Each structure stands twice: as C-alpha cells, then as structure tokens.
C-alpha cells in the first residue's frame, strides 16, 4: 500500500512538472510568433536600446520589483488591448495574457479586473481628479505601510527593551 502511494505521488509530481514545461514551451512559441509577426529581430528594432528590460534590471530590490513589474504588466496589457482586433496574432496574445494572469494575478479574476479598472481611469477628468485627491488621505497609509513598519521596528529596538548592553539602565540615562 505504501509503495502504491509513493508511485502515485511520483506520477503526480511528474505530471505537474511536464505540464509546467509544456506551458512554458507554449508561451515561448507564442512570443516567437509575435516576434516573427512584428519582424522584431530586425536591426532597426535594436537601435536606441531596450524599451522595458533595462528598466526592469535597475529595480532589483525585493520591494521595488513589484512596483516596476506592475507598471510593465500595465504596459503590456495596454499594448495587447491596442492589438485586440488583429486576428493573426490573437492566439499568441491570449496565451501570453493567460500566463500573466496566472503568474502576476495568482489566477484571481477579481485582481485582474481591479488592475484593468485602475489602468483605464481617465486622469484628465476633473471629477476623477477631485475623487482621487479626496481619497488620498485614506489611500496613503496603505501605500506607505512598509515604511511605517520599518520605523516602528527601529524605534522598538532603540527604546524600551532593544539590544542595549545593560537593560536595567533606562534609555534616557544612556
């Protein structure tokens, strides 16, 4: 019985690994299809350097990567939206969007819809500007949560029980 479970677990692992390879291979094929369609291997495309990749490599700290990744995903979603009527490349675009959906949005349709909704808000509309400024006081604490947590941790270690040599002496006496 134990051997049967081990074999089933092994088969499950192999199936998962092979499906991941298949999906990755399909994604690469679809990207290659887009490159061929747009003739993006041509020398004139390389002139002026990379459009997105250099920016991505400049943002390598753990907290920074999510910020720039969301902007890059937004860029590609806008690009795909502009190309949505092109039937010749629609399958490739759909495959790439599905991969972004699975990896960036954790397959959550609600997160994807919220993301797309944010990218489509018309920032030149006066009513939108007024609403956004009105909400800013509520939004900012959520956006700067990491910064305030770092400050709180730093304060805790230096005052009232942090790593002082003699904890019996008050911080004000040091």
Swiss-Prot record:
<protein>
    <recommendedName>
        <fullName>Interferon gamma</fullName>
    </recommendedName>
</protein>
<dbReference type="InterPro" id="IPR009079">
    <property type="entry name" value="4_helix_cytokine-like_core"/>
</dbReference>
<dbReference type="InterPro" id="IPR002069">
    <property type="entry name" value="Interferon_gamma"/>
</dbReference>
<dbReference type="GO" id="GO:0006959">
    <property type="term" value="P:humoral immune response"/>
</dbReference>
<comment type="subunit">
    <text>Homodimer. Interacts with IFNGR1 (via extracellular domain); this interaction promotes IFNGR1 dimerization.</text>
</comment>
<feature type="modified residue" description="Pyrrolidone carboxylic acid">
    <location>
        <position position="24"/>
    </location>
</feature>
<comment type="similarity">
    <text>Belongs to the type II (or gamma) interferon family.</text>
</comment>
<keyword id="KW-0325">Glycoprotein</keyword>
<keyword id="KW-0341">Growth regulation</keyword>
<keyword id="KW-0051">Antiviral defense</keyword>
<keyword id="KW-0873">Pyrrolidone carboxylic acid</keyword>
<keyword id="KW-0732">Signal</keyword>
<dbReference type="GO" id="GO:0005133">
    <property type="term" value="F:type II interferon receptor binding"/>
</dbReference>
<dbReference type="GO" id="GO:0002250">
    <property type="term" value="P:adaptive immune response"/>
</dbReference>
<feature type="glycosylation site" description="N-linked (GlcNAc...) asparagine">
    <location>
        <position position="39"/>
    </location>
</feature>
<dbReference type="GO" id="GO:0051607">
    <property type="term" value="P:defense response to virus"/>
</dbReference>
<keyword id="KW-0964">Secreted</keyword>
<dbReference type="GO" id="GO:0010508">
    <property type="term" value="P:positive regulation of autophagy"/>
</dbReference>
<dbReference type="GO" id="GO:0005615">
    <property type="term" value="C:extracellular space"/>
</dbReference>
<feature type="glycosylation site" description="N-linked (GlcNAc...) asparagine">
    <location>
        <position position="106"/>
    </location>
</feature>
<dbReference type="Pfam" id="PF00714">
    <property type="entry name" value="IFN-gamma"/>
</dbReference>
<feature type="signal peptide">
    <location>
        <begin position="1"/>
        <end position="23"/>
    </location>
</feature>
<dbReference type="GO" id="GO:0005125">
    <property type="term" value="F:cytokine activity"/>
</dbReference>
<comment type="function">
    <text>Type II interferon produced by immune cells such as T-cells and NK cells that plays crucial roles in antimicrobial, antiviral, and antitumor responses by activating effector immune cells and enhancing antigen presentation. Primarily signals through the JAK-STAT pathway after interaction with its receptor IFNGR1 to affect gene regulation. Upon IFNG binding, IFNGR1 intracellular domain opens out to allow association of downstream signaling components JAK2, JAK1 and STAT1, leading to STAT1 activation, nuclear translocation and transcription of IFNG-regulated genes.</text>
</comment>
<keyword id="KW-0202">Cytokine</keyword>
